[in-house]
Amino acid sequence: MKKEVIYLTKEGYEKLKTELDNLKQKLMFEIAERIKEARELGDLSENSEYQEAKNEQGRIAARINELENMLSKAEVIEGLDTNVINIGNWVIIKNLETGEEKTIQIVTPHEADVFNNKISFESPIGRILVGKKVGEVVKIKAPKGVFKYQILGIKV
């Protein structure tokens, strides 16, 4: 049976690892302390502080499990080059109509964050850009129409 692999950039892997470490610390110390304090208040059946702490403990434990599962399947993408756009590359593109330049990073779906210009290689824009080279012009369909962009640069 083939093992499922989750590809991540080095930055994405480190971010998930840090989140995991922080959640483990929070679960071990902060939540355990809240549960202990809530127990000291008496009757647990009507103790909302206790129930809230236990619920948060469950949510954190589920996220820890999810992160551990992802990281166990993770393979960090290395050996990036700047000749062809691939996962992990930063890409400088220019809107040929407005002249606006934008820098985006092509990442895996687990790392995508449009507010920080991290675009999944599986997204419509990502699929168009992966494999392209500096100087090429691409057409990107957006809700407001079709836009032409020129690829100005590829960085690691």
UniProtKB/Swiss-Prot annotation:
GO MF assignments: DNA binding; RNA polymerase binding
InterPro entries in the record: GreA/GreB_C_sf, TF_GreA/GreB_CS, Tscrpt_elong_fac_GreA, Tscrpt_elong_fac_GreA/B, Tscrpt_elong_fac_GreA/B_C, Tscrpt_elong_fac_GreA/B_fam, Tscrpt_elong_fac_GreA/B_N, Tscrpt_elong_fac_GreA/B_N_sf
Biological process terms in GO annotation: DNA-templated transcription elongation; regulation of DNA-templated transcription elongation
Any Pfam family matching the protein: GreA_GreB_N
Chain segments annotated as coiled-coil in the UniProt record: 8-75
Keyword list, A-Z: Coiled coil, DNA-binding, Transcription, Transcription regulation
Domain of life from the UniProt record: Bacteria
UniProt entry tagged with the keyword Protease: no
Function summary: Necessary for efficient RNA polymerase transcription elongation past template-encoded arresting sites. The arresting sites in DNA have the property of trapping a certain fraction of elongating RNA polymerases that pass through, resulting in locked ternary complexes. Cleavage of the nascent transcript by cleavage factors such as GreA or GreB allows the resumption of elongation from the new 3'terminus. GreA releases sequences of 2 to 3 nucleotides.
HAMAP family xref list: GreA_GreB
Family under the similarity heading: Belongs to the GreA/GreB family.
The protein, known as: Transcription elongation factor GreA
